[in-house]
Amino acid sequence: MATHWLLLVYRIPREPTAGRVFVWRKLKQLGAIALQDAVWVLPQTPRTQEQFQWLAAEITELKGEAVLWQADQLYATDSDALRRQFMEPIEIEYRAILSDLKKKNRDLSALSKRYQETAARDFFASELGRQTRDKLLAAGGG
């Protein structure tokens, strides 16, 4: 299955630094991955496209420039490498949730919230995510 990608290319003034930090934090929150210094990628979905469009508008408000591209990966020595870059941190987060779910003093509400935040960045529907959801529901935290 071919994945279509969105690329956000931007330039933002160095000063004040708060704008640069805001954009970086937002990109991390969205689950975007940096391909180069100011080239970030997300799998294309209606939601991610809207999120990148909003961020591009915010970059413009910060006196920066932003261009949003739609792209297909035509060649790579390892065609699944980019997909794995998205999946690896997500699966680490799911494993941590599953580990915390086994603890006696677990906070199901907090674990459920962590699951929801992780699932929002799980662009490729990880099997571990499904298992985590099922175990949370069985524990009464879903």
Q: Language-model features: where?
A:
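Positively charged, polar, low-complexity stretches
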Residues: M1-K103, Q116, A120, K135-A139
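C-terminal, charge/polar-rich interaction regions
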Residues: S109-G142
